[in-house]
Amino acid sequence: KVEDNDELRRIIDSGDFGAWRIFLHPQQREYAEKSRNGSFRLSGGAGTGKTVVAVHRARNLARANPRARVLLTTYTRNLADDLASQVHQFSGAQTVKRLGGSGVYVSGIDQLVWAIMKRARSGIADAVKDVLGHPREDPLKSSDVSWDQAIDEAGRILPAEIATTAFFEAEYETVILPYRVTTESQYLSVRRQGRGLSLSRARRMAVWKVVAAYRSAGRAEGGTSFAERAAIAAAWLERTGQHLFDHVIVDESQDLTPAHFQLLRALVAQGPDDLFLCEDSHQRIYGQKV
């Protein structure tokens, strides 16, 4: 552990890049070490050390309780691999490969979803119905259905600003999936807070026709999209009440979707140090504001 500026100077002079990557400035130590009564969000700009805080916090929680199950996750597999390599920089620190095992489990969010659905096996069927309204032959199979196809089939009456893949992807991921909307009547009454574009009843009905076409094609194909799998995994965890982790730490949380957050919430029971989110709200690349 780097204790002060003199230690930082020693690291710089020695050229120890590994130590530099996990250098924790004294001003950051509170966030890495302080116990919280519940969930906590750490927000800061690029280069403020949020990732280092996340890595140190995961390691500290695992050291404080060797039986603790600690999840360290982020949006992409590459970022997760980088987090794992930083954890391994600590003397004697290791990551675990088994989902729900004691220690620090590092994974990209989509890989985490996959592991949860593999764990659920046939028990995932009810969760699929909760989210999509109908079963899928192989929920782990990646779907090739596109929104462009559904719009061409059922969205010809929609105005140009709505008849786009970008609109439907966002509507699906921020409204339909997290609220588990499976029927037109549900969609006509669901809240669309934060979407920035109001829809009349007639427009909602027209939008739903496209969603129905998209889901019908997905059902015929038998697979699911990444976004659908995240919502399905969250629904399964909620159904079973399985809390696979004691602590969940998220790096780059600004890039996650509402279904991802539902998943993370379901992974850990509410309590001390349950959820710790590190975000840069000015660098939202993939997700939408939650």
Map each language-model feature to its residues.
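Conserved adenine-nucleotide phosphate-binding loops and their immediately adjacent elements
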Residues: V2-R21
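Extracellular cell-wall/glycan-interacting regions and their flexible linkers
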Residues: E7-R10, A206, V210
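Conserved helicase motor core of SF1/SF2 NTP-dependent helicases
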Residues: F17, R21, H25-R69, Y75-D130, ...
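Short coil/turn segments at secondary-structure boundaries
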Residues: A46, E184-V190, E221-A231
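ATP-hydrolysis module of ASCE/P-loop NTPase motor domains
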Residues: R121-R203
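Amphipathic alpha-helical interaction segments
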Residues: F167-E171, K209, E228, I232
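Extended, charge-rich low-complexity regions and/or helical-solenoid scaffolds
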Residues: Q186-R191, R195-G196, R201, A231, ...
